Regions:
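Catalytic alpha/beta core domains of metabolic enzymes, predominantly
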Residues: 125-138, 142, 147, 169-311, ...
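Active-site mouth loops of central-metabolism enzymes
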Residues: 23-41, 85-93, 169-181, 236-246, ...
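Glycine-rich, proline-tolerant flexible connector loops at the mouths of alpha/beta enzymes
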Residues: 33, 54-77, 111-123, 129-133, ...
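N-terminal active-site wall of soluble small-molecule enzyme domains
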Residues: 61-103, 327-331, 343-344, 365-369, ...
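Alpha-helix-loop-beta-strand connector modules within alpha/beta enzyme cores
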Residues: 66-88, 137-153, 218-227, 377-379, ...
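Hydrophobic faces of well-ordered beta-strands that scaffold small-molecule active sites
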Residues: 26-32, 57-59, 84-90, 107-109, ...
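Glycine-rich tight-turn/loop motif centered on a GG-T
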Residues: 105-140, 168-178, 381-390, 434, ...
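N-terminal amphipathic alpha-helix/helix-capping segment at the start of soluble metabolic enzymes
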Residues: 1-31, 36, 146, 150-152, ...
Length: 619
């Protein structure tokens, strides 16, 4: 991007009494998954979310009855001493939005379905005049909501979802990040004509790369048009457990690190109050002031197309395990790096989650044939096995010595790098391992890449952040948010996470592959997407996710979405190969891509039926 996003400063809007944007803290929110007509259950869950630390709570209002009942929920919360602003989530129903806008502090609408029916994915070319007439129709449909919001000082979030763009947008722009940003800009301009500025914007997708690109694109468009509305960040259908946290942190953290984002929601297929501690950790890691330590120049460095021979055989970024702290390299040690034990005694299987290279202090006498090691240069010189053992240099050692590996050499540097020395390194047979302490040198890798680009140098880079964490969730969030943007932007050739706290290599190696999996940079297992559920869901989604994973977890590379409802599910699981979508009380529809292939399957049979259909469709 030509525009420095970290110079973007949002304007301030109020969600009830709470200011959002500008220099205010990044606000945290979650969404209930109770039936909005069940006042008692909704109030109890709102309280749990608020007590966990949320600034706002969102509830679904899919119909007028649900919208009207928001008044009862708000009243009961206030009686219990809770005045946290409430947000109504609207799809397909302007009447519900207008009712809710007079009750709650904020209403979320989706440009893809507020004034339009569900996308049919049928191309519908419009002339310029016809296109403008469509915008006029949307303008007319928005006017009642605008008037109600102006009267009640209610804020509107224009929330664009990648999976629910209108046919009009998709025909002209495709199902693309650009189309998402344009969809929001069309609504922004309508609101501006009406002098309505209590707006928040969001660009959401289950694909972190699309979410990041769409949000950056929207920021660029707003800057060019002179707008500065606050931004809500989130990754839809992030899932649960480690994947849910890693996928969310990769997308949200990438943007927070660039100074983009005023409120966040971490969408997990778990109890909604579980989202708040994760969101808090992200916000604590990227507080408002951190961006001012970022380089003035925004990173545009790209990893070179030409790769050393070793990298050409790996489908995606490299993973390196650092075992320099191990006193012995035995079978148990290799298992920590992701290798499996073969039935043949003493031999190993290089599983999909096994590190591609292992850095060690010394070279063992016997190296399992599936393992590739990296050792200090002086050790490598004396080792006879040059096939699976590679040297680790300092830049100075590389320049001073002419004996090198013909295919792959690793050169270790850090924030202390000497650019003149790096100019003398052959990038065709070398990769740079850049090590740094992200707590003290958050943007050291940005400075390094900018310096390389300024000097017309182009290396394959392995980022090697060194953490000191004792809690796995802390490490997951920090590592994913730090590395996600470099992976998504294709700036690096691989990653290697080192942790000096209580979390060991087994966990850091798994985390490396999780980050690559969740950013879809390197697929090593089934890709699962699942929504966090809301009041529209009529079955236990957490149990459904567990069952689907048990049945289909062996299907490497397949993307399977588990969605709570028929309202949003078919659209928002965009890109999934298969979908398991709630269709009513205890019923599930199964989708192949965007086409429903089996309807109203009893929930108890749905996971088995999904697997059966997948197997039947397999070649």
């Amino acid at each position: 991007m030509s525009i420095n996003n970290h110079k973007y400063k949002s304007s301030v809007v109020f969600i009830g009494p709470t200011p959002l944007g500008g220099d205010n803290p990044i606000r945290i929110q979650s969404m209930t998954n109770t039936d909005t007509l069940d006042t008692k259950a909704s109030v109890a869950q709102c309280i749990r979310i608020i007590e966990a630390g949320a600034d706002f709570v969102r509830l679904t209002a899919q119909g007028k009855s649900e919208a009207q009942n928001l008044a009862n929920i708000k009243k009961e919360l206030q009686k219990a001493g809770f005045n946290t602003p409430l947000i109504a989530d609207i799809h397909f129903n302007p009447d519900a939005a207008e009712l809710a806008a007079a009750i709650v502090e904020k209403v979320r609408i989706n440009p893809g379905n507020y004034a339009d029916k569900r996308a049919s994915f049928i191309k519908n070319d419009l002339s310029e005049k016809e296109y403008d007439l469509e915008l006029e129709r949307i303008h007319s449909r928005l006017l009642p909501l605008i008037n109600i919001c102006q009267l009640n000082k209610t804020t509107i979030r224009v929330g664009v979802n990648h999976g629910s763009l209108s046919d009009r947008i998709m025909t002209r722009y495709g199902n693309t990040p650009e189309g998402m940003a344009v969809s929001a800009m069309e609504f922004i301009k309508i609101f501006n004509v009406e002098n309505f500025h209590n707006l928040v914007l969001s660009m959401k997708s289950s694909d972190t790369a699309i979410m990041i690109e769409a949000t950056r694109g929207l920021v660029r468009m707003m800057i060019e048009e002179g707008f500065s509305y606050p931004l809500h960040l989130g990754v839809t259908e992030a899932g649960e457990g480690e994947d849910g946290r890693v996928r969310s942190a990769s997308g949200i953290g990438a943007l927070l690190s660039e100074g983009i984002g005023d409120t966040i929601r971490v969408s997990l297929s778990e109890d909604p109050e579980n989202e708040i501690p994760v969101a808090k950790k992200l916000v604590e890691y990227y507080p408002r002031g951190i961006i001012f330590s970022a380089p003035e120049k925004q990173v545009s460095y790209k990893s070179p197309q030409e790769k050393p021979a070793f990298l050409k055989y790996i489908k995606g970024p490299l993973v390196i395990a650092n075992m320099t702290s191990y006193t012995a390299l035995n079978i148990e040690a290799y298992k920590d790096a992701g290798y499996s034990v073969n039935k043949v005694p003493g031999s190993l299987i290089k599983s999909d989650g096994a590190a591609d290279l292992i850095i060690t202090r010394d070279c063992p006498e016997v190296i399992p044939e599936q393992v590739s090691l990296v050792v200090p240069y002086r050790i490598w010189l004396t080792n006879t096995d040059k096939e699976r053992v590679y040297p680790l240099f300092s830049p100075e050692t590389f320049v001073e010595n002419r004996v090198r590996h013909e295919n792959l050499n690793l050169v270790l540097t850090g924030s202390y790098f000497d650019i003149e020395m790096l100019k003398k390194i052959d990038n065709k047979i070398s990769i740079i391992v850049f090590t740094f302490n992200p707590e003290k040198e958050r943007y050291a890798s940005d400075e390094f890449m900018n310096s390389l680009e300024d000097n017309n140098l182009n290396f394959n880079i392995i980022l090697n952040p060194v953490f000191n964490e004792d809690k796995l969730e802390e490490l997951q969030i920090k590592a994913a948010s730090l590395l996600g943007r470099y992976i998504t932007d294709k700036r690096i050739a691989g990653i290697s996470i080192v942790n000096k706290g209580k979390i060991g290599l087994k966990e850091t190696n798994t985390l490396c592959f999780s980050i690559l999996q969740c950013t879809e940079a390197r697929i090593t297992r089934t890709i699962f997407l699942s929504c966090p559920t809301c009041g529209r869901t009529k079955f236990n989604l957490q149990d459904a996710v567990k069952k689907v994973k048990e049945k289909t977890g062996h299907l490497k590379g397949l993307k399977i979405a588990v969605m709570g409802c028929i309202v949003n599910g078919p659209g928002e699981m965009a890109g999934a190969d298969w979908g398991y979508v709630g269709a009513g009380e205890g019923k599930v529809n199964i989708y192949k891509g965007t086409v429903s292939v089996l309807k109203n399957v009893p929930e108890k049979d749905a996971a088995d039926e999904l697997l059966r259909l997948i197997e039947e469709a397999s070649p």
